[in-house]
């Protein structure tokens, strides 16, 4: 057990009793009286005999727990000094005192034992953590060796392919093999409470703080406990996910956090843990975190029109969403990032299928199809029906994915600027490459107000109204902010229209004044020519 166990080791003393060597063993918790009684018993003397202990050279030895140990070659000699004559009363008093002393001794022993047990537990926890790291590293080495063997076999059998597209995955995943170094923030009670609400301000937090918030969500929902997720693996996985979001204006790690936080708030707001299994909650949260992994900043329309590698690979069918799924499971395939390592194979199959279904549902090209199916099931919604539950989960992740306008205006509006910036980057590229440009992405045709009004009115409000039928609490918390947002952008559009009308009138007046100026000049010149000379 290590050095810590030496404190429990008993002490052995050797006595010379009439030429016979007697070994006496006692623990460090014995007092002097106990040891003296033990020596008396060993030498056949009465227990109340006062004795002295002598070394081989007749030096006296103190009889107490700290007395120096000896060996069989250097035994101590026991010399009786006197036999105490005690009265019955004194014996009774001594007995009581002995019992009191024993109780005190036990109390002190308990405190000492508590301290030592605490130290041992700390040592064991550290050892378990180190052993866990070793297991992860061993699994990583096995995986690396397997991949190297497969690569060698593939190289031996590889032939030249005339295809212009490379189907090798050149994306560099960056899991952390060491223990993650981002600081573990202690979230205040106020932050923990705010984190459960849709009004949470996602702009106030740095990436490390967002990672700590995500980590807290998995612990708070009981997912770490129920699926035996290694906390170190959870942190590695979150770091790797963070590193595989690009620095796009909109589709970045903050958007990932925003969507996941909204999912987390809906779990608490709608009491989803009462409706879904813990595996469903795990799928919802993990799909939300992974739903836009490695997003390039250009949507599916661009991928298909530009015939990119992703469009070719996935046959124009939700190329981005398929790519997000692929990256998610490439990360999870690495032992040091596999948060599902303790989940049985059948459970992992269900989790994988669930995540794929939800991430593919975030393709807005499928919005009408999914909404129609959900509305059909809403007439007789059955929580015991797996198909109904799957559709509800698809709607939930869709709500969270496009939920910015549910948040307070000061939190939501900056996201519109980010989205338009990404749209304009794409439309500029489409123009330069001679590809079709969507009007809602063209910087020459769209404004913030026009971009939002139609989206809120025809996409967001109908979807959240449908969810409200199952969860009435959503109306006040999430639907009402959408109505207010619609009114805000309609007022903004009226102001924009008024400004355009005023600008148009100003331009007309300026243009008219410019055209009339030459005519007046010509008339003045003609009058001057007609006037008589002086």
Curated annotation (Swiss-Prot):
Annotated stretches, region: Disordered: 500-534
Cofactor(s) essential for the protein: Zn(2+); Mg(2+)
Pathway given in the UniProt record: Purine metabolism; 3',5'-cyclic GMP degradation; GMP from 3',5'-cyclic GMP: step 1/1
GO BP terms in the entry: cAMP-mediated signaling; cGMP catabolic process; cGMP metabolic process; negative regulation of neural precursor cell proliferation; positive regulation of cardiac muscle hypertrophy; positive regulation of long-term synaptic potentiation
Binding locations of Zn(2+): 255, 291-292, 401
Location of the PDEase domain: 175-496
Residues the record marks as active site: 251 (proton donor)
Gene that this sequence comes from: Pde9a
Keywords: Cell membrane, Cell projection, cGMP, Cytoplasm, Endoplasmic reticulum, Golgi apparatus, Hydrolase, Magnesium, Membrane, Metal-binding, Phosphoprotein, Zinc
Reaction(s) the record says it catalyses: 3',5'-cyclic GMP + H2O = GMP + H(+)
Pfam families in the cross-refs: PDEase_I (PF00233)
Cofactor: record remark: Binds 1 Zn(2+) ion per subunit. Binds 2 divalent metal cations per subunit: site 1 preferentially binds zinc, while site 2 has a preference for magnesium. Tightly binds zinc.
Phosphoserine carried by residues: 318
Broad class of the protein's primary localization: membrane
The protein's role, per its UniProt record: Specifically hydrolyzes the second messenger cGMP, which is a key regulator of many important physiological processes. Highly specific: compared to other members of the cyclic nucleotide phosphodiesterase family, has the highest affinity and selectivity for cGMP. Specifically regulates natriuretic-peptide-dependent cGMP signaling in heart, acting as a regulator of cardiac hypertrophy in myocytes and muscle. Does not regulate nitric oxide-dependent cGMP in heart.
Known regulation of activity: Specifically inhibited by BAY-73-6691 (1-(2-chlorophenyl)-6-((2R)-3,3,3- trifluoro-2-methylpropyl)-1,5-dihydro-4H-pyrazolo(3,4-d)pyrimidine-4-one). Specifically inhibited by PF-04447943 (6-[(3S,4S)-4-methyl-1-(pyrimidin-2-ylmethyl)pyrrolidin-3-yl]-1-(tetrahydro-2H-pyran-4-yl)-1,5-dihydro-4H-pyrazolo[3,4-d]pyrimidin-4-one).
Cellular component terms per the entry's GO annotation: cytosol; endoplasmic reticulum; Golgi apparatus; nucleoplasm; perikaryon; perinuclear region of cytoplasm; ruffle membrane; sarcolemma
Residues reported in the UniProt entry to bind Mg(2+): 292
Basic and acidic residues composition-biased segments: 517-534
GO molecular function: 3',5'-cyclic-AMP phosphodiesterase activity; 3',5'-cyclic-GMP phosphodiesterase activity; metal ion binding
Name of this protein: High affinity cGMP-specific 3',5'-cyclic phosphodiesterase 9A
Residues that bind 3',5'-cyclic GMP: 251-255, 292, 401, 423, 451-452
InterPro entries referenced in this protein's UniProt entry, alphabetically: HD/PDEase_dom, PDEase, PDEase_catalytic_dom, PDEase_catalytic_dom_sf, PDEase_CS
